[in-house]
């Protein structure tokens, strides 16, 4: 057993065979992969997982990062849409965020800082206590997690801002271990990992709907009120997040990475999966 931030090194060193690696914990090691954590990049869980899985299978820059850490990503994961959970007061405007202590990570730190909030770094496991004590006013969160971690007991407002997803997140295996496996076993792992993403996305989407319904109705007397952003406010929030992409492009150019080419490829694949959902629905709905 190890802490989440230690998983990458544990798997790479062989201390662990397989583990969940979260790119946002390792920005220096996974600068290309962390583009996936850009606010407002992708809102659909299945589309996001599939987009980044295909990108990884077709983009050398992504695999060079994991090769250096002696790991291989078997499947891409997701937190689902990033929302804003507020303890006592709903905030649906940029003006209302000024001075608010908001727990954020990755590109969302940039977003909330630009909106005038005070970003705070706190581990996800510490959120319940931080919300309860008033250490923070709110946090980025994910609808099913608000229910499963019982954050609804200490926070009563959830703003469905749909600020993208944390997609730099996946299941990793030690590279040497995988390469030493029989081809048949390798194929089973790859096939199972591919199937997992569809199952995970299906369950995530249904769990999000069920969690929202339960929290609106109330759980043990605790209710959560759901809010949305107006179109004009959403535009302001997106504008506040734009500098994250600009900064990422500049960093990639310094590293010799064709950032614009990478983004163009990302957008082509992203549009491919959006089109599939629009025209055919999800794989499990057919």
Where are these regions (language model features)?
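N-terminal secretory/targeting leader peptides
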Residues: 1-49, 57, 61-286
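An acidic, glycine-rich surface segment that forms the CoA-thioester-binding/catalytic face
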Residues: 53
């Amino acid at each position: 057993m190890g802490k989440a931030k230690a998983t990458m090194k544990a798997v790479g060193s062989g201390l662990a065979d397989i583990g969940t690696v979260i790119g946002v914990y390792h920005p220096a090691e996974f600068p290309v992969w962390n583009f996936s954590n850009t606010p407002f990049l992708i809102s659909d869980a299945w589309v996001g997982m599939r987009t980044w899985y295909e990108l990884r299978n077709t983009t050398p820059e992504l695999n060079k990062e994991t090769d250096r850490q002696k790991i291989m990503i078997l499947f891409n994961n997701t937190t689902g849409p990033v929302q804003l959970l507020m303890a006592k007061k709903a905030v649906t405007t940029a003006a209302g965020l000024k001075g608010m202590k908001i727990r954020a990570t990755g590109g969302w730190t940039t977003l909330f800082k630009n909106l005038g909030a005070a970003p705070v770094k706190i581990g996800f496991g510490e959120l319940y206590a931080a919300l309860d004590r008033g250490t923070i006013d709110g946090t980025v969160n994910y609808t099913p997690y608000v229910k499963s971690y019982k954050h609804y007991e200490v926070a009563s407002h959830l703003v469905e801002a749909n600020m993208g997803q944390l997609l730099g997140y996946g299941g990793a295996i030690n590279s040497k271990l995988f390469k030493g496996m029989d081809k048949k076993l390798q194929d089973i792992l790859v096939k199972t990992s591919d199937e997992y993403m569809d199952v995970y996305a299906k369950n995530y989407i249904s769990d999000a709907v069920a969690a929202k319904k339960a929290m609106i109705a109330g759980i043990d007397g605790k209710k959560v009120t759901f809010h949305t952003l107006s179109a004009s406010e959403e535009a302001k929030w997106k504008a506040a997040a734009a500098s994250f992409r600009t900064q990422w492009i500049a960093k990639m150019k310094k590293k010799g990475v064709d950032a614009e080419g990478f983004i163009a490829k990302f957008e082509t694949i992203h549009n491919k999966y959006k089109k599939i959902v629009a025209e055919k629905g999800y794989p499990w709905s057919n």
